Amino acid sequence: MIFYLHGFDATSPGNHEKMRQLQFIDPDVRLISYSTLHPKHDMQHLLKEVAKQMQYCDDPAPLMVGVGLGAYWAERIGFLNGLKSVLINPNLHPEETMQGKIDRPEEYADIANKCVSEFRLKNTHKAMCILSRVDEVLDSEATAEALKPYYTIEWDETQTHKFPQLAAHLPKIKAFKLG
């Protein structure tokens, strides 16, 4: 089972396409949707929704996959549920990058302060990160520097921030899920 978390653009047709591509790894791909506008509510909703879906899961190794803002949540929700995560162009600092896009981006900083201290250290090797060298939204070099002490970093030379084509990375994602 794969839980897919969309980015800030929840209605993008690319979400359906990415879910279809992920079905080459596991036919059971589930969209876990969230508002993107209310961080504290989103966190509660995502925790509850993943817990509910896990009740009906017979997969010994379910996987969280998120893109952009969805990768921010995949890392945290995956950690809190003991799941591996694939972070695609993760938005590591939405309290900064979401300024002017949502009402209270400072809620992300509050969430970070309330999270388990040094959660990445405790989550080492339980996530892999796929970064685009041509991400037009986020600084992928800074993201790599922040995450490389904890997670494997895979680079893509052609995809943009929304990462429409996962095909080149599906074998690595599958190996990570099963490994």
Swiss-Prot record:
Region forming the signal peptide: none
Assigned protein family: Belongs to the UPF0227 family.
Superkingdom: Bacteria
Protein name as it appears in the record: UPF0227 protein Shewmr4_1727
